[in-house]
Amino acid sequence: MHRSTTALVLCLAPMAISATHSASAGPDLATRLQVHGFASQAAVHTSENRWLGDSPDTSTEFTELGVNASLRLSPRLLVSGQILSRRAGDMYDGAPALDYGLADLKLLYSDAYRLGLRLGRLKNPLGLYNETRDMPFTRPGIFLPQAVYFDKVRNLVLSSDGVMAYGELYRGFGSLAFDLVAGRPLIDDNVEWAYLNQDFAGDLDIDGVSWLGGIWYSSLAERFKLGLSWADLRLAFDPDAGAPFTIGPGQTDILYWIASFQYNAEDWTLSAEYAREPIEWR
């Protein structure tokens, strides 16, 4: 049986709003405060794929709106955040939510290196596109490859509440960078359907601290980029007492990793990623 999906997206380019200031606000507020936004609207025609819900024909329920701001409080400290509204079929209803909100502290920095900490709701540094996956003009296509960036569990891999250590070393051959996150990713009903195949009576939540990280190499001018990123987390299910038709308590261990490659030419980019996600239920 022939199945097909056709998509069209209308993207509004990034909007930048300069901060106005008065004498009492300080003459440099406009250089320290930045506000940006983006918007996109897609139309999807599919035969029988049921893309993100019951959409067998044509659907326009694919809208993304984002507003973000950052304020540099000092040469070492930056605070930033983003509110995102995302409508995607039956899975996301467009309710505004905090996408990220963090404080970024530079511990050490020079022309040769930088080392810092981020605290708050963090975008998980997984693969080439996870941190910017909701900005349509950063994606390689209308939708990201679902083998690597599975939208059904998007919230689980998108961001975490926790702390991140990051660093970068600049040399004549390019740069080496690392990220290490300790925190708690976000859980929603879509995650339970994806890993347990049903919305059972009970609670599915993150068990303990989850660890995420990545190491990256970029050549001069970022012509080549190579990276390996990973997430190690555990989901625990606690069934409701006396509930019929449920499963017993248990844990799902997930080790998710992505190998990434990118080549940037003047007029085109070649990207390739390979992902594995071994899962163990016990």
Task: Describe each PLM feature range.
Residues M1-D28, G141:
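Cleavable N-terminal export/targeting peptides
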Residues D90, K106-L117, V153-R282:
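Signature for the C-terminal beta-barrel architecture of outer-membrane proteins
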Residues P27-V35, A42-H45, P56-D188, Y217-L220:
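Outer membrane beta-barrel
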Residues Q34, F38-T60, L228-L233, F237-T252:
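Outer-membrane beta-barrel transmembrane domain signature of Gram-negative proteins
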